[in-house]
């Protein structure tokens, strides 16, 4: 089953991928408030779907691949977790490789996967990781950039 971006899914009349149906999300760029709001919406949707899941927040600036592996692994308290990774653009190579490997695994077996929601500020820093994760099956949620007055009205 091909994973479509949210824009492609809407154009084809398909439902928008959600935290309940897709284990790996990338919230990319745009207005910082809307970016944060998109992450919160995905997190709340995942918490409604999996009320017993533990929510873990990581900052890619100082998190390593061991912390990510531990966050997505089952714990004594719950079988799955909801992992929020902020500042994805600052992830080191080893963390990026670990995330890509987990994304491939999670997309192939979503019923047992933890939910991962990554937040990227946009720009070219970390673009290679975004491309690798998208290719591995992550759903990219591109956030609107409100630089023009017309965009702010909507």
Residue locations for each model-derived region?
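Non-catalytic interfacial helical region
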Residues: 2-15, 19-25, 30-154
């Amino acid at each position: 089953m091909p994973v479509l971006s949210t824009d492609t899914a809407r154009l084809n009349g398909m439902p928008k991928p959600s935290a309940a149906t897709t284990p790996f999300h990338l919230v990319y760029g745009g207005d910082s408030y809307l970016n944060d709001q998109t992450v919160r919406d995905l997190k709340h949707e995942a918490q409604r779907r999996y009320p017993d899941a533990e929510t873990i927040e990581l900052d890619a600036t100082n998190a390593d691949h061991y912390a990510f592996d531990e966050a997505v692994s089952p714990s004594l308290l719950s079988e799955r977790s909801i992992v929020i990774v902020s500042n994805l653009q600052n992830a080191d190579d080893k963390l990026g490789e670990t995330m890509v490997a987990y994304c491939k695994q999670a997309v192939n077996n979503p019923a047992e996967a933890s939910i991962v929601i990554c937040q990227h500020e946009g720009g070219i820093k970390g673009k290679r990781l975004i491309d690798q994760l998208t290719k591995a099956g992550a759903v990219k949620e591109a956030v609107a950039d409100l630089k023009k007055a017309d965009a702010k009205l909507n």
